[in-house]
Amino acid sequence: MTILNHNPVYGATQKTATTKVSSATAIANTDLDDTPTGTALLLTAPAGGCAVTRLTGQLVEPNLATACQLNLYLSKDSGTTMRRLKSVAHAAYTWAVTTAPATDDFGYTESAPLRLEASDRLYAQVRAGTAVTDAFAFTAEYAELVPDA
């Protein structure tokens, strides 16, 4: 049986959300789910939900030169419980005027977006061996979803 979508949903408004995240010293492997520490709120989905089409993290603090892990969490209860959605590795980088730090892409695209329901929240976290304040900037590009009237 074929199920037809009689109420298509379209992206109405393109938006961007951003946050800076500090790296916490030695976040334990057991601190990766449910109630992780050192997270920062990146995005709260609007009333109609949204489709995240790009999500990146970029090193912005020159005092963090070690490799680290960038984590993305989803919360459906206003941040009480967070589930890790995805992690990307950030390679070690030494600041120099002739090079730029890499932008780490979480892999969401317009053809393969991360769909969020109304009020879902995305949180970002950096796991590194060195504590650095505001070490990474996370950016989410998304489209607010509105049902076709």
Region locations from a protein language model:
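Beta-rich globular "head" domains
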Residues: 35-76, 83-86, 133-147
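General helical structural elements
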Residues: 19, 24, 58, 87-88
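C-terminal interaction-tip segments
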Residues: 1-40, 44-47, 117-121, 126-149
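Arginine residue identity/basic-tract feature
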Residues: 54, 83-86, 115, 121, ...
